[in-house]
Regions:
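Left-handed beta-helix
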Residues: 2-29, 232-419
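Conserved N-terminal catalytic core of the sugar/cofactor nucleotidyltransferase
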Residues: 2-34, 41-49, 54, 59-148, ...
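Short coil/turn connectors at secondary-structure junctions
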Residues: 28-30, 77-78, 100-101, 129-132, ...
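Conserved beta-strand scaffold positions in the cores of enzyme catalytic domains, especially
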Residues: 55, 104, 165-167, 290-293
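Residue-level signal for inorganic ion chemistry
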Residues: 66, 120, 140, 182, ...
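A short acidic, often aromatic-flanked loop/helix-cap motif at beta-alpha or helix-coil junctions
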Residues: 110-115, 174-176, 208-210, 300-301
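Conserved core of the sugar-phosphate nucleotidyltransferase
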Residues: 146-268, 372, 397
Length: 419
Protein backbone atom coordinates (compact mmCIF):
# COMPACT_ATOMS: atom_id res chain seq x y z
CA UNK A 1 0.00 0.00 0.00
CA UNK A 2 1.21 3.51 -0.73
CA UNK A 3 2.47 5.31 2.37
CA UNK A 4 1.87 9.02 1.86
CA UNK A 5 1.89 11.90 4.36
CA UNK A 6 -1.50 12.15 6.01
CA UNK A 7 -2.31 8.64 4.86
CA UNK A 8 0.28 6.30 6.42
CA UNK A 9 -0.01 2.83 5.00
CA UNK A 10 -2.95 3.97 2.89
CA UNK A 11 -3.76 3.42 -0.76
CA UNK A 12 -3.36 5.55 -3.84
CA UNK A 13 -7.12 5.98 -3.91
CA UNK A 14 -6.85 8.03 -0.72
CA UNK A 15 -3.51 9.74 -1.23
CA UNK A 16 -3.62 13.30 0.10
CA UNK A 17 -0.14 14.65 0.89
CA UNK A 18 -0.42 17.14 3.71
CA UNK A 19 2.87 18.16 5.19
CA UNK A 20 4.82 15.40 6.89
CA UNK A 21 8.10 14.02 5.60
CA UNK A 22 11.79 14.50 6.09
CA UNK A 23 12.01 18.18 5.21
CA UNK A 24 13.85 20.46 7.62
CA UNK A 25 12.80 23.55 5.69
CA UNK A 26 15.81 23.59 3.36
CA UNK A 27 15.45 22.92 -0.34
CA UNK A 28 16.66 19.40 -1.15
CA UNK A 29 18.98 18.80 -4.07
CA UNK A 30 17.33 16.31 -6.36
CA UNK A 31 18.72 13.15 -7.90
CA UNK A 32 18.14 13.86 -11.58
CA UNK A 33 16.95 11.11 -13.92
CA UNK A 34 17.38 11.76 -17.64
CA UNK A 35 15.67 9.25 -19.94
CA UNK A 36 17.60 9.44 -23.22
CA UNK A 37 15.80 7.33 -25.76
CA UNK A 38 13.84 7.41 -28.98
CA UNK A 39 15.01 7.98 -32.52
CA UNK A 40 13.58 11.49 -32.95
CA UNK A 41 11.91 10.50 -36.21
CA UNK A 42 10.26 13.90 -36.68
CA UNK A 43 13.77 15.33 -37.15
CA UNK A 44 14.84 12.83 -39.82
CA UNK A 45 17.20 12.80 -41.66
CA UNK A 46 19.27 14.67 -39.05
CA UNK A 47 18.19 12.33 -36.27
CA UNK A 48 18.76 8.62 -36.90
CA UNK A 49 18.65 5.46 -34.82
CA UNK A 50 22.44 5.40 -34.47
CA UNK A 51 22.59 9.14 -33.78
CA UNK A 52 19.30 10.31 -32.18
CA UNK A 53 18.51 13.93 -31.56
CA UNK A 54 19.58 14.04 -27.92
CA UNK A 55 23.19 13.43 -29.06
CA UNK A 56 23.06 16.30 -31.58
CA UNK A 57 23.72 20.01 -31.35
CA UNK A 58 20.46 21.33 -32.77
CA UNK A 59 20.76 24.89 -31.48
CA UNK A 60 24.20 25.83 -32.78
CA UNK A 61 25.47 26.21 -29.22
CA UNK A 62 28.36 23.76 -29.57
CA UNK A 63 26.90 21.09 -27.30
CA UNK A 64 24.24 18.42 -27.65
CA UNK A 65 20.73 18.59 -26.24
CA UNK A 66 21.77 15.96 -23.67
CA UNK A 67 24.80 17.99 -22.59
CA UNK A 68 22.61 21.08 -22.34
CA UNK A 69 20.13 19.21 -20.13
CA UNK A 70 22.83 18.02 -17.72
CA UNK A 71 24.33 21.52 -17.54
CA UNK A 72 20.90 23.08 -16.88
CA UNK A 73 20.21 20.65 -14.04
CA UNK A 74 23.62 21.02 -12.35
CA UNK A 75 22.63 23.84 -9.94
CA UNK A 76 19.74 21.83 -8.46
CA UNK A 77 21.07 18.26 -8.47
CA UNK A 78 22.93 16.03 -6.05
CA UNK A 79 23.50 13.31 -8.66
CA UNK A 80 22.63 12.70 -12.30
CA UNK A 81 21.52 9.34 -13.70
CA UNK A 82 21.01 8.80 -17.44
CA UNK A 83 18.97 5.89 -18.78
CA UNK A 84 19.65 5.10 -22.43
CA UNK A 85 19.77 2.20 -24.86
CA UNK A 86 22.75 -0.11 -25.08
CA UNK A 87 23.47 1.21 -28.58
CA UNK A 88 24.01 4.74 -27.23
CA UNK A 89 25.70 4.14 -23.88
CA UNK A 90 29.22 4.70 -25.27
CA UNK A 91 28.28 7.98 -26.97
CA UNK A 92 26.50 9.17 -23.82
CA UNK A 93 29.58 8.34 -21.74
CA UNK A 94 31.78 10.25 -24.19
CA UNK A 95 29.54 13.31 -24.04
CA UNK A 96 29.18 13.27 -20.25
CA UNK A 97 32.61 12.60 -18.73
CA UNK A 98 31.50 14.41 -15.55
CA UNK A 99 28.77 11.82 -14.86
CA UNK A 100 30.11 8.71 -13.06
CA UNK A 101 29.97 5.64 -15.28
CA UNK A 102 27.88 3.77 -12.70
CA UNK A 103 25.19 6.44 -13.14
CA UNK A 104 24.72 5.57 -16.82
CA UNK A 105 22.07 2.85 -16.97
CA UNK A 106 21.77 0.87 -20.21
CA UNK A 107 18.36 -0.61 -20.95
CA UNK A 108 18.51 -3.70 -23.21
CA UNK A 109 15.42 -2.64 -25.20
CA UNK A 110 12.86 0.19 -25.08
CA UNK A 111 10.10 -0.46 -22.51
CA UNK A 112 8.66 3.10 -22.40
CA UNK A 113 9.17 5.78 -19.78
CA UNK A 114 7.80 4.01 -16.69
CA UNK A 115 10.33 1.19 -16.88
CA UNK A 116 13.23 3.59 -17.52
CA UNK A 117 12.31 6.10 -14.82
CA UNK A 118 11.22 3.40 -12.39
CA UNK A 119 14.52 1.54 -12.76
CA UNK A 120 16.54 4.70 -12.17
CA UNK A 121 14.42 5.63 -9.14
CA UNK A 122 14.82 2.13 -7.69
CA UNK A 123 18.60 2.17 -8.20
CA UNK A 124 18.78 5.61 -6.57
CA UNK A 125 16.64 4.36 -3.66
CA UNK A 126 19.06 1.46 -3.13
CA UNK A 127 22.07 3.80 -3.23
CA UNK A 128 20.74 6.89 -1.46
CA UNK A 129 17.62 5.82 0.42
CA UNK A 130 13.90 5.87 -0.32
CA UNK A 131 13.55 9.47 0.90
CA UNK A 132 15.80 10.71 -1.91
CA UNK A 133 13.94 13.21 -4.10
CA UNK A 134 14.21 12.23 -7.75
CA UNK A 135 13.31 14.31 -10.79
CA UNK A 136 12.84 13.07 -14.35
CA UNK A 137 13.69 15.42 -17.22
CA UNK A 138 13.80 14.63 -20.94
CA UNK A 139 17.21 14.61 -22.60
CA UNK A 140 16.11 16.48 -25.70
CA UNK A 141 14.22 19.61 -24.58
CA UNK A 142 15.55 23.16 -24.33
CA UNK A 143 14.88 25.89 -21.76
CA UNK A 144 15.73 29.54 -22.37
CA UNK A 145 15.26 30.84 -18.80
CA UNK A 146 17.40 28.65 -16.57
CA UNK A 147 16.75 30.76 -13.49
CA UNK A 148 13.00 30.23 -13.79
CA UNK A 149 13.57 26.52 -14.42
CA UNK A 150 15.74 26.13 -11.31
CA UNK A 151 13.20 28.00 -9.20
CA UNK A 152 10.38 25.73 -10.36
CA UNK A 153 12.43 22.60 -9.68
CA UNK A 154 13.28 23.80 -6.17
CA UNK A 155 9.59 24.39 -5.42
CA UNK A 156 8.78 20.97 -6.84
CA UNK A 157 11.40 19.38 -4.58
CA UNK A 158 9.83 20.94 -1.48
CA UNK A 159 6.42 19.64 -2.54
CA UNK A 160 7.91 16.21 -3.23
CA UNK A 161 9.34 16.06 0.28
CA UNK A 162 5.78 16.36 1.56
CA UNK A 163 4.69 13.30 -0.42
CA UNK A 164 3.37 14.88 -3.59
CA UNK A 165 4.05 13.59 -7.08
CA UNK A 166 4.93 16.88 -8.76
CA UNK A 167 4.90 17.85 -12.41
CA UNK A 168 6.33 21.05 -13.90
CA UNK A 169 3.51 22.80 -15.79
CA UNK A 170 4.54 24.91 -18.77
CA UNK A 171 2.75 28.23 -19.20
CA UNK A 172 1.19 27.83 -22.64
CA UNK A 173 2.03 30.37 -25.33
CA UNK A 174 -0.96 29.36 -27.44
CA UNK A 175 -3.67 26.70 -27.89
CA UNK A 176 -1.32 23.99 -29.13
CA UNK A 177 -2.69 20.60 -30.15
CA UNK A 178 0.79 19.05 -29.95
CA UNK A 179 0.94 18.76 -26.15
CA UNK A 180 -1.06 17.27 -23.33
CA UNK A 181 -2.56 19.59 -20.71
CA UNK A 182 -2.50 19.75 -16.90
CA UNK A 183 -5.63 20.99 -15.12
CA UNK A 184 -4.52 22.95 -12.04
CA UNK A 185 -6.74 23.43 -9.00
CA UNK A 186 -6.32 25.02 -5.57
CA UNK A 187 -2.97 26.01 -4.05
CA UNK A 188 -1.11 23.34 -2.10
CA UNK A 189 -0.11 25.82 0.64
CA UNK A 190 3.31 24.23 1.15
CA UNK A 191 5.86 26.67 2.65
CA UNK A 192 8.58 27.56 0.18
CA UNK A 193 6.46 26.50 -2.81
CA UNK A 194 4.08 29.43 -3.35
CA UNK A 195 3.25 28.43 -6.92
CA UNK A 196 2.27 24.85 -6.11
CA UNK A 197 -1.25 23.84 -7.12
CA UNK A 198 -3.16 20.60 -6.87
CA UNK A 199 -3.64 18.75 -10.15
CA UNK A 200 -7.25 17.94 -10.99
CA UNK A 201 -6.39 15.86 -14.03
CA UNK A 202 -4.43 15.36 -17.21
CA UNK A 203 -5.74 15.58 -20.77
CA UNK A 204 -4.16 14.08 -23.88
CA UNK A 205 -3.54 16.29 -26.92
CA UNK A 206 -6.86 18.13 -27.50
CA UNK A 207 -8.27 19.64 -30.68
CA UNK A 208 -7.74 23.34 -31.31
CA UNK A 209 -11.13 24.50 -29.98
CA UNK A 210 -10.73 22.49 -26.77
CA UNK A 211 -7.19 23.79 -26.28
CA UNK A 212 -8.39 27.38 -26.69
CA UNK A 213 -11.18 26.77 -24.17
CA UNK A 214 -8.66 25.34 -21.71
CA UNK A 215 -6.42 28.39 -21.93
CA UNK A 216 -9.37 30.76 -21.54
CA UNK A 217 -9.93 29.40 -18.02
CA UNK A 218 -6.38 30.20 -16.89
CA UNK A 219 -6.19 26.82 -15.14
CA UNK A 220 -4.39 24.71 -17.73
CA UNK A 221 -0.70 24.24 -18.46
CA UNK A 222 1.23 22.20 -21.00
CA UNK A 223 2.45 18.84 -19.78
CA UNK A 224 6.19 18.55 -20.51
CA UNK A 225 6.58 15.18 -18.79
CA UNK A 226 8.80 16.51 -15.98
CA UNK A 227 8.15 14.76 -12.65
CA UNK A 228 9.66 15.29 -9.19
CA UNK A 229 8.87 12.88 -6.34
CA UNK A 230 10.46 11.00 -3.44
CA UNK A 231 11.83 7.72 -4.76
CA UNK A 232 9.92 5.72 -2.16
CA UNK A 233 6.63 7.46 -2.95
CA UNK A 234 7.03 6.72 -6.66
CA UNK A 235 7.91 3.08 -6.07
CA UNK A 236 5.06 2.60 -3.59
CA UNK A 237 2.53 4.03 -6.04
CA UNK A 238 3.93 1.74 -8.72
CA UNK A 239 3.74 -1.30 -6.44
CA UNK A 240 0.06 -0.63 -5.84
CA UNK A 241 -0.95 0.36 -9.35
CA UNK A 242 1.30 -1.93 -11.43
CA UNK A 243 2.53 -4.65 -9.04
CA UNK A 244 4.10 -6.91 -11.67
CA UNK A 245 6.01 -4.04 -13.24
CA UNK A 246 7.13 -2.87 -9.80
CA UNK A 247 8.33 -6.34 -8.83
CA UNK A 248 10.37 -6.66 -12.01
CA UNK A 249 11.95 -3.24 -11.57
CA UNK A 250 12.75 -3.96 -7.93
CA UNK A 251 14.45 -7.25 -8.81
CA UNK A 252 16.58 -5.58 -11.48
CA UNK A 253 17.51 -2.64 -9.25
CA UNK A 254 18.48 -4.96 -6.39
CA UNK A 255 20.93 -6.70 -8.73
CA UNK A 256 22.22 -3.57 -10.46
CA UNK A 257 25.36 -3.13 -8.38
CA UNK A 258 26.20 -6.82 -8.03
CA UNK A 259 27.70 -9.36 -10.48
CA UNK A 260 24.28 -10.90 -11.25
CA UNK A 261 23.04 -7.76 -13.02
CA UNK A 262 23.18 -9.04 -16.61
CA UNK A 263 21.57 -12.35 -15.69
CA UNK A 264 18.67 -10.66 -13.90
CA UNK A 265 18.31 -8.06 -16.68
CA UNK A 266 18.09 -10.76 -19.35
CA UNK A 267 15.43 -12.60 -17.35
CA UNK A 268 13.26 -9.73 -16.09
CA UNK A 269 13.61 -6.77 -18.48
CA UNK A 270 11.84 -8.25 -21.56
CA UNK A 271 8.79 -9.06 -19.43
CA UNK A 272 8.34 -5.52 -18.08
CA UNK A 273 5.11 -3.84 -19.12
CA UNK A 274 5.52 -1.10 -21.73
CA UNK A 275 3.68 1.93 -20.37
CA UNK A 276 4.33 5.64 -20.00
CA UNK A 277 4.73 7.14 -16.54
CA UNK A 278 1.78 9.43 -17.29
CA UNK A 279 -0.59 6.48 -17.59
CA UNK A 280 1.03 4.29 -14.94
CA UNK A 281 1.40 6.89 -12.18
CA UNK A 282 0.47 10.51 -12.96
CA UNK A 283 -3.13 10.05 -14.10
CA UNK A 284 -4.36 7.59 -11.45
CA UNK A 285 -2.53 9.35 -8.61
CA UNK A 286 -3.94 12.71 -9.75
CA UNK A 287 -7.43 11.21 -9.67
CA UNK A 288 -6.75 10.28 -6.04
CA UNK A 289 -5.56 13.80 -5.17
CA UNK A 290 -1.86 13.08 -4.89
CA UNK A 291 -0.36 15.14 -7.75
CA UNK A 292 0.70 18.80 -7.65
CA UNK A 293 2.07 21.11 -10.31
CA UNK A 294 4.41 24.08 -10.32
CA UNK A 295 3.51 26.35 -13.26
CA UNK A 296 6.40 28.17 -14.89
CA UNK A 297 7.17 30.30 -17.93
CA UNK A 298 10.74 29.49 -18.95
CA UNK A 299 11.02 29.47 -22.74
CA UNK A 300 10.54 25.71 -23.01
CA UNK A 301 10.84 23.94 -26.37
CA UNK A 302 10.42 20.19 -26.86
CA UNK A 303 12.39 20.24 -30.15
CA UNK A 304 9.66 17.98 -31.45
CA UNK A 305 10.08 18.73 -35.14
CA UNK A 306 11.48 21.18 -37.65
CA UNK A 307 8.69 23.61 -36.80
CA UNK A 308 10.07 23.77 -33.25
CA UNK A 309 13.62 23.99 -34.56
CA UNK A 310 12.82 27.13 -36.57
CA UNK A 311 12.08 28.83 -33.24
CA UNK A 312 15.49 27.87 -31.83
CA UNK A 313 17.86 28.66 -34.69
CA UNK A 314 18.14 32.41 -35.12
CA UNK A 315 18.40 33.79 -38.68
CA UNK A 316 21.85 34.97 -39.69
CA UNK A 317 22.18 38.73 -39.85
CA UNK A 318 24.96 38.92 -42.42
CA UNK A 319 26.76 36.92 -45.06
CA UNK A 320 25.42 34.88 -47.98
CA UNK A 321 22.83 33.15 -45.76
CA UNK A 322 21.48 36.33 -44.13
CA UNK A 323 17.82 36.04 -43.23
CA UNK A 324 17.86 32.26 -42.81
CA UNK A 325 18.65 29.99 -39.91
CA UNK A 326 21.57 27.67 -40.61
CA UNK A 327 22.82 24.54 -38.88
CA UNK A 328 26.02 23.55 -40.66
CA UNK A 329 27.26 21.22 -37.93
CA UNK A 330 24.98 19.19 -35.67
CA UNK A 331 27.71 17.16 -33.98
CA UNK A 332 28.47 18.43 -30.48
CA UNK A 333 32.01 19.25 -29.46
CA UNK A 334 32.25 15.97 -27.55
CA UNK A 335 31.20 12.47 -28.41
CA UNK A 336 28.58 12.62 -31.16
CA UNK A 337 28.98 10.37 -34.15
CA UNK A 338 30.10 11.80 -37.45
CA UNK A 339 27.70 12.23 -40.34
CA UNK A 340 28.19 8.69 -41.55
CA UNK A 341 29.44 7.14 -38.31
CA UNK A 342 32.86 6.44 -39.88
CA UNK A 343 36.00 6.56 -37.76
CA UNK A 344 39.55 7.55 -38.60
CA UNK A 345 42.49 5.22 -38.05
CA UNK A 346 43.01 6.59 -34.52
CA UNK A 347 39.40 5.85 -33.58
CA UNK A 348 38.20 9.47 -33.60
CA UNK A 349 35.14 10.65 -35.52
CA UNK A 350 35.94 13.00 -38.40
CA UNK A 351 34.32 16.40 -38.35
CA UNK A 352 31.61 16.81 -40.98
CA UNK A 353 32.52 19.35 -43.65
CA UNK A 354 30.96 22.78 -43.26
CA UNK A 355 28.26 23.57 -45.76
CA UNK A 356 28.36 26.53 -48.13
CA UNK A 357 24.84 27.96 -47.73
CA UNK A 358 23.53 30.82 -49.85
CA UNK A 359 20.08 32.37 -49.58
CA UNK A 360 18.27 34.72 -51.96
CA UNK A 361 14.71 35.86 -51.30
CA UNK A 362 14.21 33.11 -48.73
CA UNK A 363 13.90 34.88 -45.40
CA UNK A 364 12.80 32.69 -42.50
CA UNK A 365 14.08 29.51 -44.10
CA UNK A 366 15.90 26.86 -42.09
CA UNK A 367 18.83 25.00 -43.64
CA UNK A 368 20.55 22.10 -41.93
CA UNK A 369 23.39 20.57 -43.89
CA UNK A 370 25.91 17.88 -43.01
CA UNK A 371 26.82 16.91 -46.58
CA UNK A 372 29.40 19.60 -47.31
CA UNK A 373 27.60 20.46 -50.53
CA UNK A 374 26.76 23.98 -51.59
CA UNK A 375 23.10 24.65 -50.79
CA UNK A 376 21.33 27.56 -52.48
CA UNK A 377 17.77 28.70 -51.72
CA UNK A 378 16.15 31.04 -54.23
CA UNK A 379 12.70 32.49 -53.65
CA UNK A 380 11.47 29.98 -51.06
CA UNK A 381 10.85 31.95 -47.84
CA UNK A 382 10.13 29.81 -44.81
CA UNK A 383 11.30 26.58 -46.41
CA UNK A 384 13.00 23.82 -44.43
CA UNK A 385 15.90 22.12 -46.23
CA UNK A 386 17.82 19.26 -44.60
CA UNK A 387 20.75 17.99 -46.64
CA UNK A 388 22.69 14.92 -45.44
CA UNK A 389 25.10 12.63 -47.31
CA UNK A 390 22.42 10.02 -48.06
CA UNK A 391 19.09 11.84 -47.83
CA UNK A 392 17.59 15.23 -48.67
CA UNK A 393 14.38 16.57 -47.09
CA UNK A 394 12.52 19.66 -48.27
CA UNK A 395 9.42 20.72 -46.36
CA UNK A 396 7.83 23.63 -44.49
CA UNK A 397 7.24 24.17 -40.77
CA UNK A 398 3.52 23.66 -41.37
CA UNK A 399 4.08 20.19 -42.81
CA UNK A 400 7.05 19.13 -40.71
CA UNK A 401 5.05 16.96 -38.31
CA UNK A 402 4.45 14.68 -41.30
CA UNK A 403 8.12 13.69 -41.34
CA UNK A 404 7.35 10.81 -39.00
CA UNK A 405 5.02 9.42 -41.65
CA UNK A 406 7.83 9.65 -44.20
CA UNK A 407 10.05 7.60 -41.89
CA UNK A 408 7.28 5.04 -41.45
CA UNK A 409 6.95 4.77 -45.23
CA UNK A 410 10.70 4.29 -45.67
CA UNK A 411 10.64 1.55 -43.04
CA UNK A 412 7.74 -0.16 -44.80
CA UNK A 413 9.71 0.01 -48.05
CA UNK A 414 12.65 -1.75 -46.44
CA UNK A 415 14.95 1.30 -46.40
CA UNK A 416 16.41 0.54 -42.98
CA UNK A 417 19.72 1.94 -44.24
CA UNK A 418 18.21 5.42 -44.14
CA UNK A 419 16.76 5.19 -40.64
Amino acid sequence: MTDTPGNPGGSTQAAHPCGSGPSDGSVPAIHAIIPAGGAGTRLWPLSRRHRPKFLLDLTGAGHSLLQDTVERLAPVTATTTVVTGVAHIAAVADQLPQVPRENLLAEPSPRDSMAAIGLAAAVIAHRHGRDAVVGSFAADHTVADRTAFAGAVRQAALLAEQGWVVTIGIEATGPSTAFGYIHAGDPTDVPGAPDGRRVLGFTEKPDADTAAAYLATGDYRWNAGMFVVRAGVLLDHLAELRPQLAAGIDAIAAAWDVPEREEVLAERWPALEKIAIDHAIAEPVAAAGGVATVPVSMGWNDVGGFDALTELVAPRSEGPAAGAGVLDSVDSADGADGADGAETVDGSVPEAPRADVRVVGSDGALIASTSGRTVVLLGVPGAVVVDTPDALLVTTPEHSQGVKGVVDALRAAGREDLL
